[in-house]
């Protein structure tokens, strides 16, 4: 990259470094020259390696002190290189390292870009590299392109680091420790030199101030000689003289103290220089030891390689000795094997003749095996469909449970409505007595009084009582229909469960029969190989093969029938679930209609009560239209009740007929299928088999039938 590209790289990496959201400012180049933000970013990249101890070594309050900035940047650069070498196992060879002096003293953007490029390399190769790569992908396209080219440039200049022995690693650790101590001492030396420089500046300033004070003192002395004597403390010149004298003494004490501290810092600086020389000497000694350890390591590798060769040669010599000892035995065995070979040649000739005779039967056996494989695949498909039916059964059972809960809730609401209706009856009876007693003297005044009296007439009371009774009967009929529906659905589920268990047992019996037939086929193969030369045995084997093929065809037909039965059952399951959902929706709509009617009924009652309470001779003229509106609303509600009752009766009769038809069809189908399965089992276990085959099948069915049926029923009951 050119210098212009480096500046662009620095700007792009500045935007990337802001994605870490560190506490230190990191928006400009000057913010990053202190090194604090970069150190915090490194700690976020790997908090185990760049721990708190390492972070505490970075000075935060650097201000404009470029020496402290350079010290921080050196520590960060060393930490990045050590992290690449120790943790990532890479070493940057051809990459130009950043000049920390230019960064700290002049805020060079190109060198800062190199430093940020090294931090970028640590981020995309650490353990959380996916997170940082994703953050780069979310940035702008131009910034993303620059960052990707920087990563490619850095990776092209890295080489893997070879792992040394334990001694070399120990020397490496000691060398790093010494380098760290040396860097600490150098940083301390720089700090002390900076402090000495500051003290020198303070001494120079104090000396200038002292000279100015002396000049001022001299001027004052001359003035004092001209005007008043300085010995008189009451005169202003005497007081000024005393003040200047005390100030002079204080400044002298301050200069003495600063000179003493300056001497102390010089002594400390000399001690640190001595320590630096000692550390350098130790570093040189450790480097020589590291070179010696590397040479010893190479020698050890050579010796190890030669010792491996010696061990291999010794093992080869031992194996050759054993082979020579076994050679005589092998020669004797060769003679015996030649004799056996001649005998085996004669046997092979006879066996080849037998093999020619058995080839015809072998082709039939191969077709039989292929049919067995196809039957096994079909059986697995049937088991999958049975699992699907079991899942549908569980789902229907959950729906029944929810319907039961809804039924309980409706019962509780019915009880609460009963209580409210009884309370309303009591209130209406009391109000009827009050209104009949209060409206007697107003009977001959105006026609509006007669309308008010009609509100509480026995006709309205009878209508209210009749409506309450009808409401109660509708709720009772609704609960009865819910109970009948739940019982019918439960019976359907029980029948489906029984049929599913029967199909599972039949599938398991068919599987057992297939296994037995496969074992019989293997026995037939063995008998063909042993007795292929005998014609009578071959005829018997052919008959047995034909019998087994017939059994296989029968099993295949049974599986196809069961598959068709299961395919017929699946749409009926789906239709029943859809009907249940439709019934639930109708039930919800009816419940909402009932609630709306009850609310209207309560509103009408409250409005009638308010009219009766507010009724007096002065307001009789305005109550007529309201009472007429109430009567109209009561008539509309009666009509609505009648229409709802008719619709409810129609839907109830239609639903009962559909459920009865479904139950009868389901029961007839189950009986026919059960009868067919029993007839097939009786036909399959008939006289077509031999006595030994029937006995073997009877014992296997006695072993497998209880163990397969009982767990299925238990699991279904639990579900």
UniProtKB/Swiss-Prot annotation:
InterPro entries for this protein: CH_dom, CH_dom_sf, Hook_C, HOOK_N
Biased composition (Low complexity): 693-704
GO biological process terms, semicolon-separated: cytoplasmic microtubule organization; cytoskeleton-dependent intracellular transport; early endosome to late endosome transport; endosome organization; endosome to lysosome transport; lysosome organization; protein transport
Keyword Secreted: no
Coiled-coil regions, chain positions: 162-431, 459-665
CDD domains according to UniProt: HkD_Hook3 (cd22226)
Localization: Cytoplasm, Cytoskeleton; Golgi apparatus
Main localization, broad class: cytoplasm
UniProt entry keywords in alphabetical sequence: Coiled coil, Cytoplasm, Cytoskeleton, Golgi apparatus, Microtubule, Protein transport, Transport
Superkingdom of the organism of origin: Eukaryota
Keyword Protein transport: yes
GO MF assignments: dynein light intermediate chain binding; microtubule binding
Every Calponin-homology (CH) domain range: 7-123
Family listed: Belongs to the hook family.
Assembly and oligomerization: Interacts with microtubules.
Function: Acts as an adapter protein linking the dynein motor complex to various cargos and converts dynein from a non-processive to a highly processive motor in the presence of dynactin. Facilitates the interaction between dynein and dynactin and activates dynein processivity (the ability to move along a microtubule for a long distance without falling off the track). Predominantly recruits 2 dyneins, which increases both the force and speed of the microtubule motor. Component of the FTS/Hook/FHIP complex (FHF complex).
Protein name: Protein Hook homolog 3
Organism annotation: Xenopus laevis
């Amino acid at each position: 990259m050119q210098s212009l590209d480096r500046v662009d790289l620095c700007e792009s990496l500045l935007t990337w470094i802001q994605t870490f959201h560190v506490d230190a400012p990191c928006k400009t180049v000057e913010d990053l020259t202190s090194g604090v933000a970069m150190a915090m970013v490194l700690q976020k990249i790997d908090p185990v390696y760049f721990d708190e101890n390492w972070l505490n070594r970075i000075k935060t309050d650097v201000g404009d002190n470029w020496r402290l900035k350079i010290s921080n940047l050196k520590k960060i650069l060393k930490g990045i290189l050590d992290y690449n070498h120790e943790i990532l196992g890479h070493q940057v060879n051809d990459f130009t390292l950043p000049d920390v002096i230019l960064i700290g003293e002049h805020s060079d953007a190109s060198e800062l870009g190199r430093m940020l490029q090294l931090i970028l390399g640590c981020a995309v190769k650490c353990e959380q590299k996916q997170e940082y790569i994703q953050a780069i992908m979310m940035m702008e396209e131009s910034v993303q392109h620059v960052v990707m080219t920087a990563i490619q440039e850095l990776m092209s200049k890295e080489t893997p680091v070879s792992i040394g022995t334990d001694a070399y690693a120990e020397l490496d650790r000691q060398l790093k420790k010494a380098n760290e101590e040396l860097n600490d001492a150098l940083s301390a030396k720089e700090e002390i030199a900076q402090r000495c420089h500051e003290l020198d500046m303070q001494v120079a300033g104090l000396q200038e101030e002292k000279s100015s004070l002396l000049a001022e003192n001299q001027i004052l002395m001359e003035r004092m000689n001209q005007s008043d004597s300085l010995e008189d403390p009451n005169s202003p010149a005497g007081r000024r003289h005393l003040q200047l004298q005390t100030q002079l003494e204080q400044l002298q004490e301050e200069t003495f103290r600063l000179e003493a501290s300056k001497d102390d810092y010089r002594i400390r600086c000399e001690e640190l220089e001595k320590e630096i020389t000692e550390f350098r000497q130790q570093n040189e000694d450790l480097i020589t030891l590291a070179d010696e350890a590397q040479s010893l390591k190479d020698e050890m590798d050579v010796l190890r390689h030669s010792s491996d060769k010696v061990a291999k040669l010794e093992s080869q010599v031992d194996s050759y000795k054993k082979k020579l000892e076994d050679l005589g035995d092998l020669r004797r065995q060769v003679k015996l094997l030649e004799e056996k070979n001649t005998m085996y040649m004669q046997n092979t000739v006879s066996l080849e003749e037998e093999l020619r005779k058995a080839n015809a039967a072998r082709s039939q056996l191969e077709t039989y095996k292929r049919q067995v494989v196809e039957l096994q695949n079909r059986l697995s498909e049937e088991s999958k469909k049975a699992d699907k039916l079991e899942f549908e059964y569980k789902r229907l059972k959950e729906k029944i449970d929810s319907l039961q809960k809804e039924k309980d809730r409706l019962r509780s609401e019915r009880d609460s409505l009963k209580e409210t209706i009884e309370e309303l009856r009591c209130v209406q009876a009391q109000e009827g007595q009050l209104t009949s007693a209060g409206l007697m003297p107003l009977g001959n005044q105006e026609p509006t009084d007669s309308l008010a009296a009609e509100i509480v007439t026995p006709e309205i009371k009878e209508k209210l009582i009749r409506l309450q009774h009808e409401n109660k009967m509708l709720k009772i009929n609704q609960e009865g229909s819910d109970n009948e529906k739940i019982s019918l659905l439960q019976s359907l589920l029980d029948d489906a469960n029984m049929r599913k268990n029967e199909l599972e047992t039949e599938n398991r019996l068919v599987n057992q029969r297939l296994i037995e037939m496969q074992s019989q086929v293997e026995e037939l193969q063995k008998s063909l190989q042993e007795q292929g030369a005998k014609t009578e045995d071959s005829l018997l084997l052919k008959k047995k093969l034909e019998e087994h093929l017939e059994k296989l065809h029968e099993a295949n037909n049974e599986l196809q029938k069961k598959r068709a039965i299961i395919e017929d059952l699946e749409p009926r399951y789906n239709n029943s679930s859809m009907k249940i959902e439709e019934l639930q929706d109708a039930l919800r709509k009816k419940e909402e209609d009932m609630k709306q009617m009850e609310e209207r009924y309560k509103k009408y009652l409250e409005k009638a009560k308010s009219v009766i309470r507010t009724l007096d001779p002065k307001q009789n003229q305005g109550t007529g239209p309201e009472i007429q509106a109430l009567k109209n609303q009561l008539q509309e509600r009666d009509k609505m009740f009648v229409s709802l009752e008719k619709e409810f009766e129609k839907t109830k009769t239609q639903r009962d007929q559909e459920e009865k038809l479904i139950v009868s069809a389901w029961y007839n189908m189950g009986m026919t299928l059960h009868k067919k399965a029993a007839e097939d089992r009786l036909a399959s276990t008939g006289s077509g088999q031999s006595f030994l085959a029937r006995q073997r099948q009877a014992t296997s069915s006695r072993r497998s039938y209880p163990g397969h049926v009982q767990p299925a029923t238990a699991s279904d009951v639990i579900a």
